[in-house]
Structures are given as structure tokens and as C-alpha cells.
UniProtKB/Swiss-Prot annotation:
Belongs to the ATPase B chain family. It comes from the Bacteria. F-type ATPases have 2 components, F(1) - the catalytic core - and F(0) - the membrane proton channel. F(1) has five subunits: alpha(3), beta(3), gamma(1), delta(1), epsilon(1). F(0) has four main subunits: a(1), b(1), b'(1) and c(10-14). The alpha and beta chains form an alternating ring which encloses part of the gamma chain. F(1) is attached to F(0) by a central stalk formed by the gamma and epsilon chains, while a peripheral stalk is formed by the delta, b and b' chains. F(1)F(0) ATP synthase produces ATP from ADP in the presence of a proton or sodium gradient. F-type ATPases consist of two structural domains, F(1) containing the extramembraneous catalytic core and F(0) containing the membrane proton channel, linked together by a central stalk and a peripheral stalk. During catalysis, ATP synthesis in the catalytic domain of F(1) is coupled via a rotary mechanism of the central stalk subunits to proton translocation. Component of the F(0) channel, it forms part of the peripheral stalk, linking F(1) to F(0). The b'-subunit is a diverged and duplicated form of b found in plants and photosynthetic bacteria. Pfam families: ATP-synt_B. This is ATP synthase subunit b'. It comes from Thermosynechococcus vestitus (strain NIES-2133 / IAM M-273 / BP-1).
Amino acid sequence: MFDFDATLPLMAVQFLILTVILNALLYKPLGQALDNRDEYIRTNLQQAKERLQQATELAQQYEQELASTRRQAQALIEEARVEAQKIATAEIAEAQQAVQAELLKIQAEIDQQKQATLQALEGQVASLSEQLLAKLMA
């Protein structure tokens, strides 16, 4: 059934030589290529994580700067609104004073014209009374 002659040790030696040759020519370079590929993937993954972290930090920084800028813009808008309100209030007060002064001036002119008209009418009443009396007597 099984012969133990010189072929068995020769096959064992051939197997060992083939194993050494395959190990030297195929398995080690293939293992090294797989190790290099694994290292390349790990390196790229680590770099991607670092870039993602940097991008996240930059995004947070930009968000904070944007929020700060928005707050500053809102403060400037509020300040401008308050200033415009002050200016409008001052101009309204100035216009009211000008209108009040004009009203006083017009009232004074009306009073003066009223007095002049009353004096003229008093003078005419006296002369008309004399004319009426003269006509009635005549």
C-alpha cells in the first residue's frame, strides 16, 4: 500500500524547496504588498480624520465669527436706529417750535389787524352816526 523508498524523502525535500522558493518569491512580497497597502490605508484614514477635525474646527470658528459679526451688525443697526430716532425727535421739536413761533407771529398780526380794523370802524361809526343823525334831522 505505501512504499518507503527514496521518493518519499525526495518529495519532502522538493516540498521544502518549493515552500522556501514560494515563501521568498510569492508570500513575502505579497505579504509586504498587503502590509504596505494596509499602512497606506491607515495613513490616509488618519490624514482624513485630521482634515475632518481641522474642517470642523474651521467651521466652528467661522460660525463663531459669523455670529459675532451678526451681533456687531445688529448693534450697529440698533445704534443707527436710536440715532435716527434722536435726530427725528430733535427735528420734530425744532419744527414744532418753528410752527409755534409762526403761530405767535400770525396771532400778533391778526391782533394788530383786528385793532387797526376796530379803530377804523370806530372812526367810521362816529362819522356814520353823525351822517345818520344829520339825515334824521333833516
